[in-house]
Amino acid sequence: MGREPDRIGYFSFTKKATQEAIDRACTKFKVPRKDLKWFRTLHSLAYQWLGCTYTDMIQKQDYKDFYNQHGIDISKSIKTDDVPFGEEDSGLSLIDLYRVKNTSLEEEFRNHGHIKGGLQRLQRIDKLYRLFKNQRGVKDYTDLITEFNKVAQSPRLDIVIVDEVQDLKPNEWEMVRIMMKQATATYLAGDDDQAIYSWSGADVSKLIDLDCHLQVLNQSYRIPKTIFAKSNNLVSRIKKRINKEWQPRKEEGKIRNTNFESIDLNEGQWLILGRTNYYIDEVSKELKNKGFFYEKNNRLSISNDIATAYRSWIALQNNEEISYSHVKIMYQFMSVGNGGVSRGKKGLPGADMESQYSYETLSKEWGLNTPLNYSWEVALIRITESDRNYIKHILRSGHELDEKPNIKLSTIHGAKGGESQNVILFSDISKRINDNMWANRDDERRVFYVGMTRAKENLYIVPSTSPYEFEEILR
């Protein structure tokens, strides 16, 4: 690598991104994972550097206790994982927002507009929350960054790499600058056109104003010509941005403005994007009514266990063997007794967890009494009627419960970093987003730019049937 692995730091926002970076580094440079001790999220770095333990961190039970004491559910408004708190909440997120932006609760309240209970309610909740943490001796994620910055020291790293810097909040920029002071070289990777988390405190202006050597990756391996032209036209309207020269793939690609009902989803890979979960939920209902099998926000339209039980029974009928874990899941949905699984056998006591199991083995040794010619809905009698009807609807419609559905639904924010052969992008926005958009339209330009650029071949833009839509993508 040219440097000792423990003198290199790679920092990103999600555990998934850091794990992927570790995998790539281990493969390319032939180093053991344990040597890459500073490949972490920023919060994990602060946690490690401050010497924190599990008991130092606020837990779900603490939030439940806070609710029981004060009747206030603050858990969805404070950062507790790799993803930010929800965009459309009751205003309680301002209690976290002012801390990550290094501002004040009063300032964020003025910028936000009306909130039920007003500023006094927010101040009271903020005080109660701080007192609660102090009494229990616990920290939340934002406290980790705050305390790291107060110490103003970091691991002595020769090389610092920070990914997705367009999403850094002011307190995280402060943290990065502390590391930069001690580093020989710093590499910041990001795209200001994809800065879509301003509502959670991210400050893209710090990237745009950065005085540094700029290197643009000038070739896209995803975006075809037509989608390149339309998406570039959209972001060119952003008032303050870094101008970039880059090239699309040589393929043309296609863009259509059309209604959702006219699109044939049976063939190819599809990613359906909405600005908020409300629109995704509406599409989800329609797809379920039509018998499509799909994935919404990384979850199957039917539970993983039900899908696994169904596939397992079909596999046994096809004379295939199934794994120990799949047998256990399948047994959950079978009755106990003569027509199902013998009493005491559902948990597979004493079975080898590494083995594969045929129908013959299960029926002779592991209590499976269900005849092999029984249909899946008879064999898996404990699947609820509504789920059975949905599976039958999927099968009647000519679809299958494949391992990976060909249709995925997501908010635009949830799909960042993803891609698909075909993308359907709804132009709908909520009234709240519409009202806020006039103060900073550039934020929505960036969001819909991210949505458009998920498409590898075809982009279908669906006009809104409501008064509220981001009409710029229809031009």
Give the residues covered by each predicted segment.
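Conserved two-lobed SF2 helicase motor
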Residues: 38-41, 139-144, 148, 405-413
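Conserved helicase C-terminal RecA-like lobe
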Residues: 316-462
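Conserved helicase motor core of SF1/SF2 NTP-dependent helicases
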Residues: 13-16, 155, 159, 166-251, ...
